[in-house]
């Protein structure tokens, strides 16, 4: 079947005197069946000023008006339309069903696989994951666990472990925080991750603090994301995992 025809045209006649800022794009706010936690970072982000911007939106030849922003920013009325020429998009912990393969740590307690780097703690000859990070030529994402995620194969029967995690990009502009939970049930390891504290921006400008206070979707959409996984330990040399995200 053919998809819908979408036409978008934006003409901005004046861009001077803007004070861009960082924003975690709320792309996940409307997803009903997420396949990951979308950590999409917009650097040097700006809103489009109504006075100097013409926007045309057509879907199946039907024109739509762009949403406007409820409060003025930089003494101007703005469209909710936002853009950035510097983005860093990470789909974290995508849904997965299949076998898990072992990774061999180096002597400095790190391991890399498919562009993802793991920092480990070694306790009683068992490795624990304390940090995961990845980067492109310009930006970097960090996922930290406190306490570190233990060696799941060696967990005692019936044990339940709780911890916290935080996600930051470039260690500066804000963070996503939440909890993780691990439980061993017979021959299965059950894991749960929820970003229940949402996104906390790190902005000092008062107008941005007001913006994030009144437009709550920017901070709160991650709170609705829940990840569950089950890892089968029937054969410790041939681990199998099924994991998925859902909105709650």
Residue ranges with predicted function:
Residues 1-248:
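Structured soluble/peripheral alpha/beta segments that form catalytic or ligand/cofactor-binding pockets
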């Amino acid at each position: 079947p053919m998809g819908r025809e979408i036409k978008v045209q934006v003409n901005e006649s004046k861009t001077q005197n803007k004070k861009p800022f960082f924003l975690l794009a709320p792309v996940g706010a409307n997803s009903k069946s997420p396949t990951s936690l979308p950590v999409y970072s917009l650097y040097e982000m700006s809103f489009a000023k109504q006075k100097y911007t013409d926007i045309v939106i057509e879907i199946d030849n039907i024109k739509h008006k762009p949403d406007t922003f409820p409060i003025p920013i930089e003494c101007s009325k703005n469209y909710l339309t936002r853009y950035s020429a510097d983005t860093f998009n990470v789909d974290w912990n995508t849904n997965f069903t299949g076998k898990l393969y072992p990774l061999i740590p180096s002597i400095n307690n790190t391991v890399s696989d498919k562009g993802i780097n793991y920092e480990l703690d070694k306790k009683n000859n068992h490795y624990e994951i304390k940090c995961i990070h990845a980067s492109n030529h310009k930006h970097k994402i960090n996922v930290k666990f406190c306490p570190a995620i233990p060696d799941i194969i060696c967990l005692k029967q019936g044990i339940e472990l709780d911890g916290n995690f935080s996600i930051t990009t470039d260690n500066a502009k804000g963070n996503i925080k939440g909890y993780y939970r691990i439980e061993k049930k017979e021959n299965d390891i059950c894991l749960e991750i929820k970003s229940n504290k949402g996104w906390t921006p790190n902005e000092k400008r008062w107008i941005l603090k007001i913006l994030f206070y009144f437009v709550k979707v920017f901070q709160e959409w991650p709170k609705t994301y829940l990840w569950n996984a089950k890892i089968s330990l029937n054969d410790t040399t041939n681990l199998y995992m099924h994991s998925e995200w859902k909105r709650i």
